[in-house]
Amino acid sequence: MTIVLNPKKPLSVNPLKMSQPLGASLAFLGLKGMMPLFHGAQGCTAFAKVVLVRHFRESIPLSTTAMTEVSTILGGQDHVEQAILTIVDKNKPEIIGLLTTGLTETRGDDMEGILKDIRQKHPQLKNLPIVFVSTPDYKGSLQDGYAATVEQIVATDYNAFIAENARSAVIYPQPQVTVLAGSSLSPGDIQEIKSIIEAFGLMPLVIPDLSRSLDGHLEDGYQSITGGGTTLPQLRSLPHSCYTLAIGESMRGAAEILKDRFGTNYEVFPRLAGLEAVDTFLWRLSQIVTSRCDHHFPIVPNIPALFERQRRQLQDAILDTHFYFGGKKVALALEPDLLHQTAWLLTEMGAKIQAAVTTTKSPLLEDLPVDTVTIGDLEDLEDLSAGVDLIITNSHGTAMAQRLNAPLYRMGYPVFDQLGNGQRCLVGYRGTIQFLFDVGNILLAEEANHNHQLSVGVHVT
């Protein structure tokens, strides 16, 4: 069992973690017609917007209640009310995601009571879903805020907000499965998961669906709210799902809520990268098709041939790359779900995890292929990473990698010095292949550079 270390440092040096409000806004951005609303100072929203814009290189719709020193002392109900009314008037959202920040959490605003009063005061808000989530940024991390938001999304009764001429629910002829997509998944990852599920004749209902909002596509015109994502009719069809697939341990809580509300059985998949992990996922899908759902149409009883070929391609990629992974020392600094997936995949390839640093507590931390994992910052990682062959973390690790004279593979949030983050896919057979080739090429280049330096040294001598 891995020992989890949580040193009591008086400050964070070269921070690793992103805040809960950032994670919450990311989850909200996976819903169509959404406007995330930060209840806090303007700077809180500006920070999240800058991080997300730099990472995805897309327009990010965020709004704020713009709390000031005076309103923080006297109370922020008027600011929340005015912000909601302004958003409704100017942006015409289908849904609003209201999240708190450290400022308003410290004050202790009664947000449920505030929303109730606002609805009573303004009947025009009767049919507008407003999903509230508590996300203090002085504790937890991006993954915590994201998970809490998904839990609130699936806990909300959207049938209570049906306007005239609105669609109550989407009913598909195929069996529907709910997919709870964790914060470790990129829009490209989610698209790959959807394609895999659809190949089995199932209809995936992804929450939140970033593959429809932050995948990097041109809209016909300017969008002041999210132009894609999980729709309200899809959210109303949650009771019709025959199974829930939770991708990432952090999605277990949301899966439990769906089971309690609708009796939908679920399974948690801690990772979807690596031969064994993807095999397990595909096997479960085949079992859902053949035994879990009511089906009245031709179905695919076994694993589609497409994935048999992809599996063989992954086996070949493993053979091609394992020479460069074997015995390599790797340092990781990632959110828990992503750390677990990456650490096990590297270990399966023969690499050794020399250092592991993460942002928050998780049951997965006790099941890592490493003796200890530290809940800390990038300074902790640097102290543990002397002599490593590879560092995997976000773009904030660039200077550290240069000081350690080790290559950096960018992963997590934010990645602001690399293009294509919205399309990047590292799950499934194809995503695993891409990861192995990406990292393998880095290690191959380092080995070639090292051999060149040795040959130059011998020649000079």
UniProtKB/Swiss-Prot annotation:
Give the pathway listed in the UniProt entry for this protein: Cofactor biosynthesis; Fe-Mo cofactor biosynthesis
Where is the chain membrane-spanning?
none
Entry superkingdom: Bacteria
Q: Which Pfam families match?
A: Oxidored_nitro (PF00148)
Q: InterPro entries per the record?
A: ChlB/BchB/BchZ, Nase/OxRdtase_comp1, Nase_comp1_CS, Nase_Mo-Fe_CF
Q: What biological-process terms (Gene Ontology) are attached? A: nitrogen fixation; protein-containing complex assembly
GO molecular function terms noted in the UniProt entry = nitrogenase activity
Keyword list (alphabetical) reads: Nitrogen fixation
Family, per entry = Belongs to the NifD/NifK/NifE/NifN family.
Biological role stated in the UniProt entry: This protein may play a role in the biosynthesis of the prosthetic group of nitrogenase (FeMo cofactor).
Q: What is this protein called?
A: Nitrogenase iron-molybdenum cofactor biosynthesis protein NifN
Per the UniProt record, the source organism is Rippkaea orientalis (strain PCC 8801 / RF-1)
